Amino acid sequence: MRTRRVYLPLKGELSMDWHDYLGPLGRGAWVTIQFTLYSMFFGAVCSFAFGIGKLSKNPFVKGFSILYIEIFRGTSLLVQLFWLFFALPIAGDMMGIDLRLSPVVAGVLALSLNLGAYGAEIVRGAIQAVSPSQYEAATALNFSSSQALWRVALPQAIPEMMPSFSNLAIAALKDTSLVSLITLHDLTFAAEQLRNFYQDSTTVYTMVLLMYFGIALVLSFFMRLIESSVTRWRGHRR
């Protein structure tokens, strides 16, 4: 993912026309959309990995999954972002290891890990909500524990997860605004630059508000499409 710099006119070219804001805000919005999609993808991977891990019979896997979930649910996303970007390199220098992360990597990593911690609880809850009779039927068919999970529990649990994952997707979109604090040129960063230059807070932040709302509407629409597809897929399996 590449971020773009926001180019502003010279002060002699100062203009209060809202059309002048569209270019910088549009480029910032594209960065925001990319961060949202990346964090959703990697967050979903973490959700299933650690949600299933929390149900594991292996004490190490279960313990590590619980530790991850509690740490990232119990601490601020902003602090997690700052720790990865500012504190981790210092800790690495103390150990003689280069642990410096680019703003893009630090941003995606923090958003994904935080999203995954909340998603893991959704996955765990949906799997545990599957009727015990389904597991009994799987046992009667001589399924192993992993076969029962992948062939019986998950196909029934995934449709139940989708509404909650849709909410997490919207939360991920809004959380991307924090990456502006580590110098990433997202929509919020572009808005702050425009506000500082033009001193036109009302117009700039009204446009940003509408752009976030528009992105959220599109994201909600696609999440509903995915939810409908998953529901139809489940119906075909019956």
Swiss-Prot record:
Single Gene Ontology BP annotation: amino acid transport
One GO location term (cellular component): ATP-binding cassette (ABC) transporter complex
Domain of life: Bacteria
Coiled coil: none
Keyword list, A-Z: Amino-acid transport, Cell inner membrane, Cell membrane, Membrane, Plasmid, Transmembrane, Transmembrane helix, Transport
Domain ABC transmembrane type-1: 29-223
Subcellular location: Cell inner membrane
Membrane-spanning ranges: 33-53, 77-97, 103-123, 152-172, 203-223
Gene3D superfamilies in the cross-refs: MetI-like
InterPro entries given in the database record: AA_ABC_transptr_permease_3TM, ArtM/GltK/GlnP/TcyL/YhdX-like, Ectoine_EhuC, MetI-like, MetI-like_sf
Membrane topology label: Multi-pass membrane protein
The keyword Iron-sulfur belongs to this UniProt entry's keyword annotation: no
Similarity comment text for this entry: Belongs to the binding-protein-dependent transport system permease family. HisMQ subfamily.
Reported function: Probably part of the binding-protein-dependent transport system y4tEFGH for an amino acid. Probably responsible for the translocation of the substrate across the membrane.
Entry-linked PANTHER family: L-CYSTINE TRANSPORT SYSTEM PERMEASE PROTEIN TCYL, MEMBRANE COMPONENT OF AMINO ACID ABC TRANSPORTER
The name this protein goes by in its record: Probable amino-acid ABC transporter permease protein y4tF
Species assigned in the record: Sinorhizobium fredii (strain NBRC 101917 / NGR234)
Lineage: Bacteria, Pseudomonadati, Pseudomonadota, Alphaproteobacteria, Hyphomicrobiales
